[in-house]
Curated annotation (Swiss-Prot):
Record GO terms (molecular function): chromatin-protein adaptor activity
Phosphoserine sites (modified residues): S50
Protein name (record): RAD9, HUS1, RAD1-interacting nuclear orphan protein 1
Comment, domains: The RAD1-binding motif mediates interaction with RAD1.
Main location as per UniProt: nucleus
Location of this chain's protein in the cell: Nucleus; Chromosome
Motif mapping: RAD1-binding motif: 54-60
Length: 235
């Protein structure tokens, strides 16, 4: 068992002096208080509490609020009860979709179709139709530098365009990427600047320091002052 703590007296007894000061109590930090001899009587008026605070704005008058806050205490049972999930009282927000192009609506309508339609006959997937006007609009929005180009599937063109301009299937495949990429895009990217030149075959196995000092390397090699271990790379 640990030893019991002894309770100490918080308030110490006042010191008692056997002799009283001869000249009365002394004030070290301020002047001595002289006795009041002349007194004047002033007539007093009763104060009305209702008129005193009439100029105070009601939003700053917290006398009534402080009364309720003092007596209010949270109950123990209220703290233990779990918080219930409150349902949302506000209506859901409705978003208006912007006007999309005809090609986007065709692709979205194909995705929205139910998957469990077994009785319906199989249909061909919808493919967006590109006209010369739409190709011109796409060339403005699509960036000119594309990493790769996909070959399009079988494109269904309207009958009127087929009758006017008969085009072979090979020309269709070639015209589709050109209308997307635009006429000014190059077919292959241009090679960039050469950072490091290739090492010639005759200099294989020679250290880089001696490749840069060609004249000194040839002179020392002719004089026989360079060994093979000094200028050759060890493998």
């Amino acid at each position: 068992m640990p030893p019991k703590k002894r309770r100490r007296q918080s308030q110490k007894a006042q010191l008692l002096f056997h002799q009283q000061p001869l000249e009365g109590p002394k004030h070290h930090y301020e002047s001595c208080q002289q006795p009041i001899t002349h007194t004047v009587q002033v007539p007093s008026k009763p104060i009305d509490q209702s008129t005193v605070t009439s100029w105070v704005s009601p939003q700053f008058d917290r006398a009534a609020e402080s009364r309720f806050l003092i007596h209010w205490k949270p109950h123990r049972d209220q703290a233990r009860r779990p918080t219930r999930r409150s349902t949302c009282k506000f209506p859901r927000l409705t978003f208006e979709s912007p006007q999309s192009s005809s090609s986007e609506t065709l692709l979205l309508s194909n995705r929205v179709q139910p998957q469990n339609s077994e009785k319906d006959p199989p249909r061909r997937p919808l493919v967006p139709l590109f006209s010369p006007q739409s190709c011109g609009e796409l060339s403005v929005h699509v960036p000119h530098s594309l990493p790769h180009v996909f070959a399009p599937p079988d494109i269904q063109t309207p009958d009127s365009s087929v009758r006017d301009d008969p085009i072979s299937p090979d020309q269709k495949e070639n015209s589709f990427p050109s209308c997307i990429l635009g006429p000014g895009t190059p077919s292959s990217p241009e090679p960039g600047p050469v950072l490091v030149k290739d090492t010639p075959e005759e200099k294989y196995g020679i250290k880089v320091t001696w490749r840069r000092r060609r004249h000194l390397f040839a002179y020392l090699k002719e004089k026989g002052k360079l060994d093979g271990s000094q200028f050759l790379v060890k493998i």
